[in-house]
């Protein structure tokens, strides 16, 4: 049996140009996203009625991890990056088919732009340019299980850090980008095995390099470059 051929229906534009700093799960940080359909699928009829839903599912491809192949076991960040578990017990990108699944907030469907229809949303956990393979509406009556167990994750987003972001540096970003950036930093983008309070990290966001340190549960932004 031949392998299925996936059609890329759209690509998402996000503030993240690199993998470092991208939220580990969707919905953790309200970062803006813009979904632009590929020309064969750029049809207003295809999204008719979608604006009635507050959230959507995005099925997408870990295109930057495909060349590295898959692994039966991985080391999830929630376990400190040292303990291995099965890949199917995680959302690791190193999967046999390299597919990702994200629930994001749908803010609006734009129909008056040159490349319309365009979807605007928040909460995506993807690098800018990531290929989208399918879009489905989120159905709260079918997709939400409040009593579900979370396995080794504990069922929550984990501890969030305090963010000290000097106002003059935060002002370098558009108003629509600021809250998402603060949330992404609060979610601790560092590899879990790195805990050096003297180390300066750099995260690209919105075309700028955010330089910061982490000490005693606080992210201290020290510079914004670019």
For the regions a language model picked out, list residue spans one by one.
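Mixed-charge, low-complexity intrinsically disordered regions
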Residues: 1-99, 111-120, 124-226
């Amino acid at each position: 049996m031949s392998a299925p051929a996936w059609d890329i229906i759209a690509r998402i534009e996000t503030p993240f140009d690199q993998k470092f700093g991208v939220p580990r799960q969707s919905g953790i940080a309200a970062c803006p996203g813009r979904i632009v359909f590929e020309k064969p699928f750029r049809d207003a009829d295809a999204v008719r009625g979608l604006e009635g839903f507050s959230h959507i599912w995005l099925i997408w491809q870990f295109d930057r991890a495909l060349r590295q192949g898959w692994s039966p076991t991985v080391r999830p960040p929630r376990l400190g990056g040292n303990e291995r578990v099965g890949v199917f017990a995680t959302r690791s990108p190193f999967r046999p088919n390299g597919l990702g699944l994200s629930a994001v907030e749908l803010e609006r469907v734009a129909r008056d732009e040159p490349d319309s229809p365009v979807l605007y949303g928040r909460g995506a956990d993807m690098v800018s340019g990531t290929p989208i393979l399918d879009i489905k509406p989120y159905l709260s009556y079918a997709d939400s299980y409040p009593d579900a167990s979370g396995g080794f994750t504990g069922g929550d987003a984990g501890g969030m850090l305090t963010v000290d972001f000097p106002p003059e540096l935060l002002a370098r970003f558009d108003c629509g980008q600021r809250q998402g950036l603060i949330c992404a930093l609060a979610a601790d983008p560092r590899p879990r095995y790195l805990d050096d309070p003297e180390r300066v990290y750099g995260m690209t966001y919105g075309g700028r390099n955010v330089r910061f340190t982490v000490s005693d549960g606080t992210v201290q932004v020290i510079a914004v470059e670019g």
